[in-house]
Amino acid sequence: MRRSFLLWVLVLGVVAQARAQAPATQFGFVFGSVAKVVQGTDTLAHAWAGGLNTPQFSTIDLDGDGRADLYAFDRQTARSYTFLNVAAASGTGRRWQYAPDYESLFPGDLSGWALLRDYDCDGRADLFTYANGGDIRVFRNVAGTGGRPSFVLANNQLSFPVANGFISNLNIGSYNTPAIQDVNGDGRLDILTYDFVGSTVLELYLNTSPGSCGGVSNFVQSTNYWGQVVTCPDCSSYQFAGATACRPYRIEHSAGHSILLLDLNGDGKLDLLDGRDNCPQLTRLLNGGTSTVDGLLTAGGASSAFPSAAAPVSLPVFPAPYSFDANFDGVPDLVVAPNMTDNTLDFVSMRRSIRLYQNGAASASAVPSFSLASDGFLQNDMLDVSEGSAPAFGDLDGDGLTDMLLANQADLVNGYYRASLYYYRNVGTAARPVFRLASDDYLGLAATAALMPSVKFESLRPALVDLNRDGALDLVYSVWNGTTNRLTYILNTAAASQPASFSTARASYFKPQGAAGSGVLPARQGDTPCFFDIDGDGYVDLLLGTNDTQEAGGSLRYFRNQGPAAGGNVDNLFVLANANYGQLLDNGSRPPYLAPAVADFNGDGKPDLLTLSGRGTVMLYSDFRSQNGTFAGTNELFFNNFTSQYEPARLGKGFILRFAAAAADLNRDGRPELYVGTETGGLISYLGRNGTVLAARPAAAAALALSLYPNPAAQAATAETAQPTSVRLFDLAGRLVRGASPLARTHRLDLAGLAPGLYVVQATAADGTSTSQRLAVAP
C-alpha cells in the first residue's frame, strides 16, 4: 500500500511539473489506444479501426517503401481506410497494420465507388471514382512528401465520341462498379461496365489516349454487347447468344453489378466474375470468344457455385470481387465483400461478411485455385458488432476496473434481426486495460426480444449512471420497438463496488414530461441519452440527442432531474427544461441522429460537451455550462500528423449514419479518452492531445483557496475553503460520484468504494463562484 501511495505522489508530481512547463497549444484528439481487446484466444490487431461494412479494396504504396499497402473505401459510409504492409511481430512474414494518418491523403468528397489503378505507368496507383450522375472522374497520384500519395484531378468526366461528331459522357450509372483493366493488352487501362440505363448488357470502352502507356483523355466504345449476354431478372440468370429470352413476370432486382476480369482457366483470355445487387452469389462466366475484346460468354461456362461447389461465395446482398495479394505470398487472392449502399431494407448481418479466398496457385501467372481462408478478412481483427455501435463504460464486476458495454443497431442472428449488448470485461490492470469479450448478449436482451418477433428491438444505445444515488451504476438504454423509442432503465440492486445485479423483470422506462402543459415528449429511433449534472444541484440530469424532426425544438434536449420533487418515482425523474439546448446546427440545419457526450476533455476542470451528428460532424463545446443561447464550438479537433494541423473528423458521410460517443479514462492517466461508435459497427479510440492533466487554478481558486488533503487519499479526504462552499466529486468522464454537500468551510469526502484513479473535486460558493482540483484516490 505504501509503495502504491508513493507511486501516486511521484506520478502527480511529474505530471504537474511537465504540464507547468508545456507551451499553451490547441487541444484536440489524435488516433490512439490505451486498451487491448481479446476475443477468444485472439488479441485484435485492429481493434479500434471502427469496423467495416461495404469495403472496396485496392492496393497502393502509401509510405513510399515500395511495398503494396491496402486501401479500402467503404461504400455505405464513404469513408477511407488505410493499412500498411509491415513486418509481422514475430519477425517473419508480413501483416496489415491499420494506419489512419494516410486516410487524409484521399479526397474527402468520394462517394459510390473508388478504385486505385495506375493509368500512366509511373508506379503510383491513381484514383478512379464515381462522379455525380454516374460519370467517372480520375485523380492522378503525384509524388507527395516522403513518397506519400498526393491526388490531383486529371479528368472530371471521362467521355467517348458518338455519331455525328458528338461526345457522350462515359456513364456507368449510380450503382454499378466497373472493371478497370487492360483488356486488349496495349498497356492502357480500359473500362468494362454494365450499361447505365438498365444494367442488363456489358459495354467495353477501350483507352485510345496517346502514348505507349496512355492516359485518360480518349476512350472509344468497342461494343455495347460485350460477351453477347443479357442479364435476366433472376439471380445468376442470363440470356446468352442464341438462347431463349429471359423469363417474364419475375421479381425484378434493383440494377447494380460489381464485376472483375480474371483469367480463371489459363487460356489467356479474361473471364468475368459478376456480383449482383440483392443476390448472394458471385457468378463465374468463362470467356469462350476469340479474345478478351471479342468476348463470348456461354451457358456452359456459367456457374454460381464459384469458386467451388463445396464453398461457393454466398453473401447476403451484392457481393463484389477484388483481386490482390491479401496474405503476402506473392500470388493474388480473391476478396469478396458486400457492396450495397445501406442496410435499411435488407436487414442482414454486417459482421464476418468479408470473404478471403486464398489463391493456392504456385505463381501469379498460374491458373488460380481459390479456397476459403477467412469469413471476416480484417473484420475479425476489429471490434465489430455489425452496425450502428454505441459504447458505455463502467465497473460492472466490482473489481475496480472499467468495463465496456457495446450495443448495436441490430444484427441478424438465428433468423432474427435484433439489437444486442456486448459485454467486454476489463481483465487488465489500472494502467494497462485489457477487454475480453464476456457475452455477446448481456442480460439476454436479444434472446428475449427474439421471443416477440412482431415487435422490433433495434437502435440500442446504452448508458451507465447512478440514478438513485446509492453509489451503484444503473443501466439505461434507448431502444426502438417499431413504433416508438423508449428510454428504459434497470436499477442496480447490488451495493456500491459490488458486481452489478440487473433484473430485466424490473425494467421500466422514463416518462419525461415536457414543459408545463405540453405533455409527454415523443422519442424517435436512434435517440441517444447522456447523463450529467447540468445545473449543479447535485442531481444527474439528462441530455437527449435526437433525430426528432416533427416536434418543435432542436436536436439536443435538456431534461432536468427533479430530485426529491419526483417523490422517489424514477419514471418521472426528468422534466423537459430546454427543447433546443445549445441551439445546435450542422451546416445551417438541424443535425440528424445527434449523439452527445460530456467530460472534461481538455483538462481545465470544466465539463465540455461533444456531439456527433448523422452527417459525421464532431463538435466540441468547451465549458458548455457557462454558455447561453447558441453554443460556440469547433469541429477542427483531429490532429493530422502529416500537416501538423487540426481538421474535422473523417468518419464518412451518407444518407443515414449512426454514431455514438463516450468518454472514459481507462488507463487512469488523468485524461479521458474519446470512444466513437460507428455506423460500421466498430469503435474508434482517440487520445486527447495538449490537454491539461492538472488544471491550473484560476483566480477564483485564489479567492476560495480550495485545499485538499491528503492527496492522494485512500478512504477519505478533507476539502477546506476560505469561505463556505458546497463540494461535489466527479470522475473524469463527468459523472457525479458524490453529491453536493451543505455549505461549509470544511468537508470530509468519503472515498470508500471508489475505484483508484483521478477525480475532480468541485467547490462552489453561494454566489456561484467555483473552483476545481484533482484528487487522486489511491489503491
Where does each model-flagged region fall?
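Short consensus segments that form the blades of beta-propeller domains
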Residues: 46-49, 72-73, 129, 167-169, ...
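Acidic/hydrophobic-patterned starts of short beta strands in beta-sheet-rich repeat architectures
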Residues: 64-74, 121-130, 185-195, 266-276, ...
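Beta-propeller blade termini
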Residues: 54-62, 110-119, 174-183, 255-264, ...
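Beta-strand-rich domains and repeat architectures in extracellular enzymes and scaffolds
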Residues: 38-75, 253-262
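Blade-edge motifs of beta-propeller repeat domains
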Residues: 21-51, 86-109, 142-172, 209-253, ...
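C-terminal outer-membrane/trafficking sorting elements
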Residues: 6-8, 699-709, 713-779
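Blade-level signature of beta-propeller repeat domains, shared across WD40, Kelch, NHL, RCC1
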Residues: 652-694
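Short glycine/acidic-enriched loop and turn motifs that connect beta-strands
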Residues: 77-78, 134-135, 197-200, 278-280, ...
